[in-house]
């Protein structure tokens, strides 16, 4: 049976988060009508254990997030592509919400409301600021769970091969193709990068990258600082220091 939805998860050295997300996904209503594709780089043994035959596993030659996302989309069979970070948890009725949204022929894709798993007040403020940004601009980040009609994705030729801001660039191009909507139900995502690096320091770094991207200036030179070493998992501190304890995922 052809799946209605293809869930594509890019992952790099993040088997523990991937395992929790897959545990959560397989319990959602409607999962039988979907396919899950994991496009991975880095920790091969840990990633294979995490997947445990619950998803199709790919190992693309290129390890940038854009390359992983495009590789997953290239083998997907669903009518709609749903790009999900390895540390994110869509709402329990996410698939139904996506199907309902795309039943409108004018809608080409969209994203979910953003909310951090962790409850720190600083992250709540950052969430509030971020919501003002994307509700005004309709430019969404990947940690909001971007979704798009498969035909539209191929029409757009997928994600551009960027080291940074590939999700924002895609979202900006998507709304030029057709109606890109915001599903008001929150998708939960880990704030570990903000906690590891310092919430305000990370926020201002993101704003700096956003400014450079908006002005069409180079952001590539900051990619290693943002992504971190290829041998380390996401959310590792930029420098030595205390890594805040993560909240338990909502499963």
Predicted features and spans:
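Cell-envelope/extracellular polymer assembly enzymes that use nucleotide-activated donors
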Residues: 3-6, 35, 169
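Short, well-formed alpha-helical segments that are part of the catalytic scaffolds
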Residues: 13-27
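Acidic helix N-cap motif at the loop->helix transition within catalytic regions
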Residues: 16-20, 43-53, 93
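A conserved acidic beta->alpha catalytic loop
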Residues: 24, 39-48, 88-89
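Glycine-rich, basic loop-to-helix element that forms the pyrophosphate-binding segment
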Residues: 60-76
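Short aromatic/hydrophobic "clamp" motif used to bind/position activated sugar donors
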Residues: 81
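Conserved donor NDP-sugar-binding/catalytic core segment of glycosyltransferases
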Residues: 92-122
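Hydrophobic helical membrane-anchoring modules
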Residues: 172-251
């Amino acid at each position: 049976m052809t799946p209605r939805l293809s869930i594509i998860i890019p992952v790099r050295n993040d088997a523990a988060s991937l395992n929790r997300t897959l545990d959560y996904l397989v319990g959602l209503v409607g999962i039988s009508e979907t396919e899950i594709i994991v496009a991975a780089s880095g920790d091969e043994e840990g990633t294979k254990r995490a997947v445990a035959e619950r998803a199709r596993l790919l190992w693309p030659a290129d390890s940038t997030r854009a390359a992983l996302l495009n590789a997953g989309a290239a083998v997907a069979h669903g009518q709609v592509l749903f790009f999900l970070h390895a540390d994110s948890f869509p709402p329990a009725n996410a698939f139904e919400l996506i199907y309902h949204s795309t039943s409108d022929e004018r809608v080409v894709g969209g994203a979910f409301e953003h909310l951090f798993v962790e409850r720190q007040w600083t992250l709540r403020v950052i969430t509030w600021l971020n919501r003002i940004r994307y509700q005004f601009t309709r430019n969404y980040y990947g940690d909001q769970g971007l979704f798009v009609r498969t035909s539209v994705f191929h029409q757009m030729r997928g994600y551009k091969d960027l080291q940074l801001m590939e999700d924002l660039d895609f979202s900006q191009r998507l709304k030029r193709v057709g109606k890109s909507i915001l599903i008001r139900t929150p998708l939960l995502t880990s704030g570990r990068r903000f906690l590891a690096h310092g919430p305000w320091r990370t926020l201002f770094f993101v704003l700096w990258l956003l400014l450079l991207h908006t002005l069409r200036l180079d952001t590539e030179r900051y990619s290693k600082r943002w992504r971190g070493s290829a041998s380390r998992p996401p959310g590792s501190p930029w420098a030595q220091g205390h890594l805040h304890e993560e909240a338990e995922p909502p499963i």
